[in-house]
């Protein structure tokens, strides 16, 4: 086996998935350490958007090692550490597990204070100086794309580069059963899981040679789900992959048009789309698990999978083979 060709322009798309995106943090840490690859764009939804932001900010500061440090630091801060946090975390995971096996009352996030969202915003602003981003972004800078959905209009919303604020990240991570919708301008936004999970069709604007998708929800399962819990978990996985598949379908349609010579010109190119998949059998409730041991385990697993991907990349599963897409202008 041979690894991924070096000196290539790479765009990385990070699927959302709550605490499972600690796996994504591990993957990105490994990619940031490999300076042979030029990361020209990152995108993400929900927890994937947070990871993409932290890695992108390090690239903006021209310090890949800073991106690694930010990913480590954020997930350490996000882990349940105090006795109160540990007890609350264990209770939430337990309740989430019960909901997959029995009917339980649901509570609107508007019935209790938004302290959880406030804490996430505090952590984001601790790690990223958002007020600096507009001046840091240059035509040659890597691109960041974050997805959310407008609750009222149903329209997908994409935040790019300097448009990405702490509130934009909160909007992309606003799971409606847990968090209130986020008001931005005239829009009211929910989690990016309902729009583009993750955004992919915008990435060709950065003119990458390849798009690497960090996938949290598995495409395939080996065993038929039969219990209520298994059925609920598989339903959630399929829902999480719905928008991802739509994004890939968009690329495949362009592929078809180019192969039929209906689209011609130098602005079209082939872009390999590859997948780095978290293949562990985890249930939906564990997406809420913020225990330190679980977070560290997933990050280590992400690093391991990323290293394997770089070593065996040419044989690693591709998503629908090679796809020609509209290529953007290089900065």
Language-model regions: role of each:
Residues 46:
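Catalytic nucleophile serine of serine hydrolases
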């Amino acid at each position: 086996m041979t690894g991924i060709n070096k000196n290539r322009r790479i765009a990385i798309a990070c699927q959302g998935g709550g605490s499972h995106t600690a796996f994504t943090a591990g993957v990105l840490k490994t990619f940031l350490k490999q300076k042979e690859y030029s990361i020209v764009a990152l995108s993400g939804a929900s927890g994937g958007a947070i990871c993409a932001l932290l890695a992108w900010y390090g690239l903006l500061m021209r310090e890949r090692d800073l991106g690694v440090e930010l990913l480590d630091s954020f997930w350490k801060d996000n882990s349940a550490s105090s006795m109160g946090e540990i007890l609350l975390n264990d209770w939430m995971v337990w309740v989430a597990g019960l909901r997959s096996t029995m009917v339980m009352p649901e509570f609107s996030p508007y019935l209790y204070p938004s302290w959880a969202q406030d804490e996430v915003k505090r952590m984001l602003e601790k790690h990223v100086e958002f007020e600096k981003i507009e001046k840091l972004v240059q035509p040659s800078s890597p691109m960041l794309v974050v997805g959310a959905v407008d609750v009222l209009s149903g329209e997908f919303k994409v935040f790019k580069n300097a448009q990405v604020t702490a509130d934009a990240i909160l909007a992309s991570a606003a799971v409606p059963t847990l968090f209130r919708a986020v008001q931005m301008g005239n829009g009211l936004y929910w989690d990016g899981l309902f729009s583009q999970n993750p955004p992919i069709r915008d990435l060709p604007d950065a003119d990458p040679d390849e798009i690497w998708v960090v996938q949290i929800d598995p495409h395939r399962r080996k065993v038929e789900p039969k219990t209520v819990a298994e059925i609920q978990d598989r339903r959630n996985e399929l829902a999480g992959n719905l928008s991802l598949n739509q994004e890939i379908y968009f690329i495949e349609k362009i592929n078809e048009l180019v192969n039929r010579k209906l689209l011609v010109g130098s602005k079209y190119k082939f872009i390999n789309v590859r997948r780095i998949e978290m293949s562990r059998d985890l249930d939906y409730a564990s997406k809420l698990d913020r225990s330190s041991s679980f977070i560290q385990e997933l990050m280590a697993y992400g690093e391991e999978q990323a290293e394997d991907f770089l070593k065996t990349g040419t044989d690693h599963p591709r998503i629908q083979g090679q796809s020609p897409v509209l290529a953007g202008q290089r900065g």
